[in-house]
Amino acid sequence: MDNQIIQETVDKILSVLPNQAGQLARLVRLMQFACDPTITVIGKYNHGKSRLLNELIGTDIFSVADKRETIQLAEHKQDQVRWLDAPGLDADVAAVDDRHAFEAVWTQADIRLFVHSVREGELDATEHHLLQQLIEDADHSRRQTILVLTQIDQIPDQTILTQIKTSIAQQVPKLDIWAVSATRHRQGIENGKTLLIEKSGIGALRHTLEQALAQVPSARTYEKNRLLSDLHHQLKQLLLDQKHVLQQLQQTQQQQLHDFDTGLINILDKIRVDLEPIVNIDGQDQALNPDSFATMFKNTAAKQQRAKVQIAYSRACIEINSHLIRHGVVGLPAEQQTTIKSIDTVIVAVFGISVKFRDQLRALFYTDTERQRLQREFRFYFEKSAGRMILAAKIEQTMRQQGCIQNAMMALQQMESAA
């Protein structure tokens, strides 16, 4: 699988699992079959990391200085092993979770060589916290962490040295501890003193590293399969969660619509009953008698009848409007609004401006065609209400998220097949 396809796969997974960038970076590293096993050396500034590396490799590759120089990754390849000198844990521009240090410790490393100077006594809080994280990671990845106590030649009192070792062993009881002196080893090499070389502890540490390196291939296979399994599980669970969310949203959407439609039908039925005394009268409908100039300012029977019709219609509108408000329909959509606020209402949009005659009431509330129109148009404005639009947007977003998760799952399967 080429790098572009791998990156596309990573991007698809990160779009739905944004917190898994570290795990994905490590997985990509493990997918690179030809990469050499990597030993990352971690430790605070001036604890002897670079000097130790030089002795282990057998040549002065890494800079040894009294000032801070390792603020980025320094590496060297030798005998099919890649050595990384990570930024110091207390470097000015690189904290523990700095990008370079994070990459060295969590993405690149197959073996972590944790360096601590015995001159500093026991582990400090930063060192102890990171070691605990590495120990926990070993349970999941089988990557080994080797704790190395350096500069033991600077503690001539063996009793004190033993006390320091014991104290550190109590801090990290799950780790074996290796005590070394790069200075003794260099002096032994330069002066041909075998005893100094043996007492330096470098030989024993090399042997331990050789054993750890022999386990890297199987550890990588285990870790790769574990990461793939974890990602599959997370994606599967996320998809199930999103399906559950979608189901709940759709049920809410359906229930809201059912409640709105049922409530509107009940109100329209009630209005029919309430309007019976108004629309069904014996004799002539006096509301139809037109006004004349002579009766313009008189309270005639025709005006009284029209007033009854208008009051009955207003009461019907109030009942319907109360139902609309209960269900979040409080105004017209923005695209239908005018500059005249008094007519920017759903009632006016559906019914019109005014109803004065009984035939108008009958047409509105007693014909099946008009009733169906009322139900259809009030439902339209219900669906245009803010709450319904937000709910519809959530449903659409959840469905898109499901699609992204499914794409990520397929991409991960393709990556796994290519592994």
UniProtKB/Swiss-Prot annotation:
Top-rank lineage group of the source organism: Bacteria
GO molecular function: GTP binding
Gene3D superfamilies according to UniProt: P-loop containing nucleotide triphosphate hydrolases
GO biological process: catabolic process; tRNA methylation; tRNA wobble uridine modification
UniProt entry keywords in alphabetical sequence: Aromatic hydrocarbons catabolism
Alphabetized InterPro entries for the sequence: GTP-bd, P-loop_NTPase
One Gene Ontology cellular component annotation held by this UniProt entry: cytoplasm
Name of this chain's protein: Uncharacterized protein ACIAD1443
Source organism: Acinetobacter baylyi (strain ATCC 33305 / BD413 / ADP1)
